Structures are given as C-alpha cells and as structure tokens.
Amino acid sequence: MIIEEAQAINSFFRSESSKEVYGLIWLLVPILTLVLGITIGVLVIVWLERKISAGIQRRIGPEYAGPLGILQALADGVKLLFKEDLLPSRGDIRLFSVGPSVAVVSILLSYSVIPFGYHLVLTDLSIGVFLWIAISSIAPIGLLMSGYGSNNKYSFSGGLRAAAQSISYEIPLTPCVLSISLLSNSSSTVDIVEAQSKYGFWGWNLWRQPIGFLVFIISSLAECERLPFDLPEAEEELVAGYQTEYSGIKFGLFYVASYLNLLVSSLFVTVLYLGGWNLPIPYIPITELFEINKTSEVFGTTISLLITLAKAYLFLFIPISTRWTLPRLRMDQLLNLGWKSLLPIALGNLLLTTSSQLVSL
C-alpha cells in the first residue's frame, strides 16, 4: 500500500499538471513577496510621518504600540478591520463598494514596473514609465465613483476635486517623464537607472534636469493629494471629501491608498532623478562592485535594494515636512498653478531637452 502511494506521488510530480502547479507557484512567489514588501513599506511610512510630524510640533508621537511606537499603524489597521462597515441608505451601493478597490488596485499595479534593485523588478517593460502614468490615471475614477455613489454633496464635491486635480497635474508630469526618456534613449525604468550609473552622483538626472525635477516633485505632491494640495479632503470645507460616508475596511483602503501613492511617487523620483540603485560614487556601478557568483549576486542585489529604499525614504521628508509648513491652496490657485505655470515650464523643458539631443547627434 505504501509503495503504491509512493509510486502515485512520484508519477504526479513527473506529470504535466505538476509542472503547471510549480509554474503557478513560482509566478505567485514574486507577486506575494512584492505585496508583503509594500505592506511593510507603508507601515514604515506611517510611523515616519507620525514621528516627524510630532517632532515638528514638539510632541512625542506614538510610543506605546511596540518599540518606539513602530506597531501603531498595524494597530490602527486592525482597529479599522473590526469596525462596522456602514452603507449609505440612498447611495449607489455598487459604486460605493467598488470605488476604494479601484483606487488601491490601480496604485498597486504601478509597483510592477519599479526596479527596486539590480535584477529586482517584476516586469521590465520598454514603456514602463508611461505605463505608470496610464495606470495612475485610473485612480481618480475610483475616487469619483466613491463620491458619486455616496449620495452626499460633500463626497461628490471631493470626488470632482480629485478628478480635476489629477488631470491638471498629470499633464505637466508627462513632459517631465518624456524628457527623461529622451535623455536615456529609453522608456524602460531599468534602462533609465543604468543610464545614470556612469558618473556617479553627478550623473544623476537631478543635475541634468533640475527644472523637470522641481515640476515633477510639485506634480507628484498634487497627485498624492498632500498639503498644500489636499483640496479633495479639505476638512474645513468638505468634512472628509469623498471619504465622508466611509467606515471600517473601506475607509482603511483609502487610508492605505494615500500612502501607497506616496511611496510610488518617492520611488519614481528615486528611479528617474536620483540614480535608482546606483551608488553616488563615480564609475562604480553596483553590478560591478562584487565578483560574479551566486552569493555575491544576492548580496549585491540586497545592497542595491537598500540603496533604493534609503533614497526613497529620505525623499519622503519633503512631503511630510510640507504638510506642517505650507498653507492649503484655493481651488482656483491650484488649477492656475497646474495649467498656467507648471505646464508651460514642463513643455519648455521638453523643448530644451529635445533641442540639446538633436544638437548632440
């Protein structure tokens, strides 16, 4: 009996179905690893923001949930999971329920084209940066669905503001990304990072595209709805904007989506302008820092991951500090800044970049 069972198990592992199962498992492993890493990254961002905000306001911040309050975000998430999920009695339940998921999924898909390190990217596409812009434009649709489905004037106004703000600041963002693609001769995120590796710190696109860098930062803050661009969630005007009618896990999804978007923006700033995983030392790419064997390749990949995350988290100090130092703009000021200031500057920067590339041919 035991021999027959062993033979059956052996025949299964040799069959075609077992190969398909193994293929499916190996397909899910990198995706699940990425989701786990993103979750940990969001928890770290929440803790950093609370601690930095407390320091700016001369408070202590979270300190009881885990060492130094590191588990406070996890405690808040568990609390939201067990809260009652209320539905508006006269709202559109389908749109109300689907809206948060659309916002979160569209942002999660953006992580698939981000190179976290050397040979550490889920999909290296030739149109990676433009795929990110296309995917990120889906998130405002979810916010508009949430605002309309809530059947609440404050929620609907917040959804309309979110859609208008996203459209206004995605357009200046696109010429900045196109300028980087022209300099790197590629739209692949991996190629863009490798194009910045030759001259170390001075080879970063930050110095080659200073105007585009400033426009990109401002547009990214507006896309993330961070102060001074948090008009869709202005508490004094709209209670909580499109989140007004939400509670429980659906409200938690919006909470997670805002920090996911913030992390995506920081990582793309790192990839496009701060050299990605490259060290700020000239002529020493991270791929050539170690001898080529399996152990050193794993070590080099780990180091490149740490370098990318260190740059991204250092950049996070800018959006966190602006939250407590700059006043909120009016809606007309926000739209004028996007259409009348940033868009002409971004187009002018693209024209200069194109001209310089043509002259250098």
Curated annotation (Swiss-Prot):
Swiss-Prot/TrEMBL keywords: Chloroplast, Membrane, NAD, NADP, Plastid, Plastoquinone, Quinone, Thylakoid, Translocase, Transmembrane, Transmembrane helix
Enzyme class: translocase
InterPro entries assigned: NADH_UbQ_OxRdtase_su1/FPO, NADH_UbQ_OxRdtase_su1_CS
EC number: 7.1.1.-
GO cellular component, one term: chloroplast thylakoid membrane
Example of a GO biological process term: aerobic respiration
Reactions it catalyzes: a plastoquinone + NADH + (n+1) H(+)(in) = a plastoquinol + NAD(+) + n H(+)(out); a plastoquinone + NADPH + (n+1) H(+)(in) = a plastoquinol + NADP(+) + n H(+)(out)
Membrane spanning stretches: 25-45, 102-122, 125-145, 246-266, 298-318, 334-354
Bilayer topology term: Multi-pass membrane protein
GO molecular function, one term: quinone binding
Subcellular localization, as worded in the UniProt entry: Plastid, Chloroplast thylakoid membrane
Main localization, broad class: plastid
Family: Belongs to the complex I subunit 1 family.
Reported function: NDH shuttles electrons from NAD(P)H:plastoquinone, via FMN and iron-sulfur (Fe-S) centers, to quinones in the photosynthetic chain and possibly in a chloroplast respiratory chain. The immediate electron acceptor for the enzyme in this species is believed to be plastoquinone. Couples the redox reaction to proton translocation, and thus conserves the redox energy in a proton gradient.
HAMAP family xref list: NDH1_NuoH
Quaternary organization: NDH is composed of at least 16 different subunits, 5 of which are encoded in the nucleus.
Protein name: NAD(P)H-quinone oxidoreductase subunit 1, chloroplastic
